[in-house]
Amino acid sequence: MALVSSLGFGTYLGECDDAEDARYTRAGAAALERGVNLIDTAINYRCQRSERAVGDAIRVAIASGTVTREEIVVCTKAGYIPLEKTPPATREDYRGFLDSEYFARGVMSAADVVAGGHCLTPRYLDDQIDRSRNNLGLETIDVYYLHNPEQQLDSVDRERFRTIMRDAFETLEKHVKRGAISSYGCATWNGFRVDMQAKNHLSLEELVTIAREVGGSKHRFKVVQLPINLAMTEAVRTPTQRLGSGTVTLLEAAQRLDISVVGSATLMQAQLTHSLPQQVKAAFPGYSTDARRAIAFAQSLPLTAALVGMKSSAHLEENLARPAIS
């Protein structure tokens, strides 16, 4: 896999329309040309439009001659059932969509779905991987995440959850062997940040153990993702992970288990782009904007990359700005 830029290009937010697609395509191509080579998306983002815009951006950047496919790290996710281009107008329309697109085709059953729209069964993952490859226009996806697997714990007990994850990891190892993905991981929201006694807690040590059981010592479970920012510091400060006989932070557990960490919500959906306290500004001198200070905080941590959503050249330039040296 290519050396990864410390800033990653995120594609979560935005309207489900052609204009937003075009903005993401332009910004993504520009980011690749400026050396931002990690792109993060998910099949459910913007009703599959984000994946397709990423594919367009990659093709534009490669055609310009400024980057090769081998220099790009593409990450996507599966778990939440993706819609097609626009959300259904009614609940009945959504049920009809599930029936025709998934249930009738045998991709999954209604019993496989939790929380109204989350699934991690092997047949469903088979389907989603090939859909994502088609959306992205790629033979191989570099990093394939299970999207918020802790969502399952709202509906199943811990024993059943382990079986779900084992089956999912076996499926992903199979797709590594066929060349559809290079590695896999878990992209989470709450799972790695909550207390160990919480119902939706995820144990990184347990996940690595499952990966070793199904994939051996050369398993391809390599990356986890979670929110890490100035306001959400659990990965750095809170010992949420049991490792051996002790408890450690997620970042320490990942380092000791040889798992890469990607930080999401770096700007907390623009909430950290303004009104930061004076002590934060003092801690990151030389930066002219709060957005850049928030990014600098994430980049100061032992992360593989910090993700930031970008849809304009102005935001790209701001996010890449180097600190002034006095």
For the regions a protein language model found, what residue spans apply to each?
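Short charge-dense sequence patches
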Residues: 1-9, 114-125, 241-245
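N-terminal binding-site loop/beta-alpha segment at the start of enzyme catalytic domains
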Residues: 1-100, 107, 139, 156-159, ...
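Generic signal for short, ordered secondary-structure residues
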Residues: 10, 33, 74, 104, ...
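Beta/alpha (TIM)-barrel catalytic core signal, keyed to glycine-rich beta->alpha loops juxtaposed to Asp/Glu
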Residues: 22-23, 28-30, 47, 123, ...
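Short beta-strand segments at enzyme active-site cores
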Residues: 39-41, 75, 140-146, 182-188
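Short acidic capping loops at alpha-helix termini that bridge into adjacent secondary structure
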Residues: 68-72, 139-143, 183, 219-223
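Active-site gating/metal-coordination segments in enzymes
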Residues: 84-145, 151
